[in-house]
Amino acid sequence: DTGSALVYGIFILVLFREGVTGNILIIGTMVVFLFIITLLINKLYVLGILVLVAAALFYFMKRNSRNILVLLSMLIISSGFVFTVDYTFENILEPHHKKRINVLLGKELDLRGAGYNVHQSKIAIGSGGITGKGFLQGTQTKYDFVPEQDTDFIFCTIGEEWGYIGSILLVILFMALLFRLIKLAERQRSDFSRIYGYGVASIIFFHFTVNLGMTIGLVPVIGIPLPFISYGGSSLWAFTILLFIFIKQDASRLQLL
């Protein structure tokens, strides 16, 4: 499914740490940008923008034939990709995925269907203000206006009950955990332990970022839990096992020859 594909896709960050060229990240960013912009505006306008950008780069590169050849190849590939966006969107994505993306991009306004969860989540977070309404005092969450408020949309519960301050504290706690994991990964003596540590940090970072993005309408709803906080035994066990395997590896690092 889409959620699993995105989770495994985050391992590109681990490969980047291990020496994979940063061009892959640049290409990936360009693909996502072209996909979104082609959904928003006519593909002919997108092609026009690509040609103008390429022409400007041609001018600045002047007589460097190698760079010009690379740029021309990228222009051809990008133009071909633009024409495949509609087919990909209409024939590969599931109907509910398409509807969520359209709601996210503002092409549809479905406050009683695909956009209901995000709309109610925004109301809950916004109504929390600076300090929140207090523990178990949130109206949107207390009266079940927000579906899945204890799993995928649990951040809106935190935002409504504890406000901006509580939300920022949660972000700080996760950032501290991630930086600590990266620091521990860097001091590992074996490649496997280091890669595993970065993998754990990447998975937690991705889940945290996408979960928050879902609740405030920055990314499509794809059903990803908030690590260690969302309700559900399987999620909690999975993240706990991931983390404690790495802690065991770190504790045993000095025993490696």
Predicted regions span which residues?
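Interfacial segments of multi-pass membrane proteins
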Residues: L6, F11-I27, Q140-G163, L226, ...
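Alpha-helical transmembrane segments of multi-pass membrane proteins
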Residues: A5-I12, I172-M175, G199, L236-L243
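Alpha-helical transmembrane bundle and helix-membrane interface signal
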Residues: T2-S73, V85-I92, R187-R189, F246, ...
